[in-house]
């Protein structure tokens, strides 16, 4: 399943209606239990009867995440899952994803410009610049290999090196 801040949810439905629609598309038998579980985990209980179009971007993000997880996928594709979120909500989403990944044993494919997020959520990384892979490895390997403090510094070093070659 896929989540992106660039894909909008149906605006005129309530949160519960949105999740129910997606649950029915996946033919989930225990849809109410699944909605209850995800709304509790993602702090959506108080929003279930709210109109989706009236939610904040952080609330919509959590609804989109619940939608993507409604059918308990084995693989979750995330495109900038915390883009435009305030630090507190972004941290909550990252913590949720870490816990959910371990609990449900799912794989997450993540596209992100947030290197702290990548470090926190990813075991294996492909760093790309202009659509070209510039390095790969796990966060610790990449940091040690390039003698930097963090992945952002690694990326900047590699990116500048690539620019000098062009």
Where is each model-derived feature located?
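Conserved ABC ATPase "signature" region
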Residues: 1, 20, 24-47
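Conserved ABC ATPase signature
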Residues: 51-55
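Conserved catalytic motifs of ABC-family nucleotide-binding domains
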Residues: 72
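Catalytic Walker B motif of ABC-type/P-loop ATPase nucleotide-binding domains
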Residues: 76-79
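Helical segment within the ABC ATPase nucleotide-binding domain
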Residues: 91-103
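ABC ATPase "signature
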Residues: 136-137
């Amino acid at each position: 399943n896929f989540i992106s801040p660039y894909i909008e949810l149906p605006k005129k439905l309530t949160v519960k209606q949105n999740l129910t629609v997606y649950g029915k598309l996946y033919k989930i038998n225990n849809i109410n239990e699944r909605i209850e579980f995800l709304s509790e985990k993602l702090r959506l209980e108080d929003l279930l009867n709210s109109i989706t179009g009236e939610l904040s971007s952080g609330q919509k993000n959590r609804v989109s995440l619940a939608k993507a997880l409604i059918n308990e996928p084995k693989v979750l594709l995330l495109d900038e899952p915390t883009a435009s979120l305030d630090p507190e909500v972004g941290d909550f989403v990252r913590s949720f994803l870490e816990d959910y990944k371990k609990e449900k044993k799912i794989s997450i494919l993540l596209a992100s410009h947030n290197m702290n997020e990548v470090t926190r959520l990813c075991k294996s990384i492909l760093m790309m610049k202009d659509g070209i892979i510039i390095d790969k490895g796990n966060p610790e390997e990449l940091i040690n290999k390039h003698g930097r403090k963090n992945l952002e510094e690694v990326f900047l070093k590699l990116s500048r090196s690539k620019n000098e070659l062009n």
